[in-house]
Amino acid sequence: MERDDCRRFQDSPAQTTERRVKYKPKKKRAKDDDDEKVVSKHPNFRGVRMRQWGKWVSEIREPKKKSRIWLGTFSTAEMAARAHDVAALAIKGGSAHLNFPELAYHLPRPASADPKDIQAAAAAAAAAVAIDMDVETSSPSPSPTVTETSSPAMIALSDDAFSDLPDLLLNVNHNIDGFWDSFPYEEPFLSQSY
């Protein structure tokens, strides 16, 4: 009788079914709509990421190595993307995936495949973007004050960033006299007079 109970117990469907545990990957936390808007505001470029404080950095991995070439920190994503394009062309050649493939022939080329030369060429490309951005942000129509007889020195002087600052030294001479008057004048102590 005991055997029949054991057999019945073993043959019962509750005991014969295996308990299978499926691996379920952890779900990513659902982002709020506000977070998605913030993420989608800045462009995504290959080899470019944004720091928490708003600066953009660019780096590229050296082929067949785990190390990376640091290309720099930039104020805009476009500058960092152009720096990455220069490095990608230098390292991978024509098979490189570029952020701006239409501008490949305008980009500076490094003197060699040395990381220092690649960094220098990347910095030059980023600086060219900064110059292009300055030209675009300036007035689109030519300035009426600049004439053909203006010398290049006068144009450079008018474009000087410091020319827009207020004259901070205007009243310095008037205030300096009052500054020295606030100190009491005393004769120096000489030990020989005693």
UniProtKB/Swiss-Prot annotation:
Its main location: nucleus. GO terms for biological process: ethylene-activated signaling pathway; plant-type secondary cell wall biogenesis. PROSITE patterns: AP2_ERF. It comes from the Eukaryota. Transmembrane segments: none annotated. Keywords: Activator, DNA-binding, Ethylene signaling pathway, Nucleus, Transcription, Transcription regulation. It is found in: Nucleus. InterPro entries: AP2/ERF_dom, AP2/ERF_dom_sf, AP2/ERF_TF_ERF_subfamily, DNA-bd_dom_sf. The keyword Coiled coil does not apply. CDD domains: AP2 (cd00018). Probably acts as a transcriptional activator. Binds to the GCC-box pathogenesis-related promoter element. May be involved in the regulation of gene expression by stress factors and by components of stress signal transduction pathways. This is Ethylene-responsive transcription factor ERF038. It comes from Arabidopsis thaliana (Mouse-ear cress). The gene is ERF038.
